[in-house]
Amino acid sequence: MEFALEVKGLRKTYKEFGLKNISMKLPKGCVLGLIGENGSGKSTLLNAILGLIECDYESLRIFGQEYAGNEKQIKEEIAVIFDKTCYDLNFTPLFIGKILSNVYSNWDMEKYHMYLDRFELPKKKKLKEFSKGMKMKMEFAAALSHDPKLLILDEATSGLDPVFRDEILDILREYTEDEEHTILMSSHITSDLDKISDYIAFIHAGELLFTKTYDELQENYGVLNCGQRIFDALNREDIEAYRKDTYGYRVLVNNKQGIRKVFSDLEIEQATIEDVMLYCVRGEKVA
């Protein structure tokens, strides 16, 4: 298997927070959704991978090359979209296109104008006159017009209306139809990740709790409601976390097929990415 991104032993220490020995791999042609609550370290990790902040690591490889010493070549193949525009608000889309044509050797002006037209963006209007949604459309138009092999999104769909978010997800699906294209996407809108992710990586308090395939989460994880008797009878290893109220237990389990064999009448709901995150962060662990 070829990997677009390989991180080993990445560390970043602040006074009251730090990334703790992060290691992860992202196969080529796949979408990895990075989840975690605000302040968990998602943006710090992405900034460290991009070289925007200093950090320590054993190895950081992108497209099979060590990032250190190959930054210029690698950055040609990466596009990054944050949750706000990175362009001067006095620039117009036409002017931005001219600038980027001199930055990227594989800039495709025809594709750029195709996206501007598709997003119905006024080409001669300054960005300061754009709404947030229009500015983010501008970011996507620019990012996708130099044919990046790795697209990194840091909360890029936050604050957008559902219609445009759905359009962006369609565009990202089109993008990954090319097996050379890979996406690393951080988002607190977990329903978006449910729709397009091949892998999910969960970071909490600067620590990577797991990286799993989306199919594995769908097949194995579930949420069940039960009383004390059933809760006590569950295999402790099958319980990821639980929440208790006056009505009983709501339990996040990681082996729903095995549990169904033992408790055939027990109803187990499909766990969403949001369920996994909420229970692991706010739920209780079994002793």
Positions of predicted regions on the chain:
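The feature captures the beta-strand-to-loop junction immediately N-terminal to the Walker
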Residues: L32-E37
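Helix-to-loop junction immediately C-terminal to a conserved catalytic motif
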Residues: L50
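Conserved ABC transporter NBD signature motif
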Residues: E58-G69, Q73-I74
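ABC-family P-loop ATPase nucleotide-binding domains
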Residues: E76, V80-E139
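ABC transporter nucleotide-binding domain
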Residues: L169-V253
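Catalytic Walker B motif of ABC-type/P-loop ATPase nucleotide-binding domains
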Residues: L151-E155
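Conserved structural motif at the start of ABC-family nucleotide-binding domains
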Residues: L5, L19-N21, K75
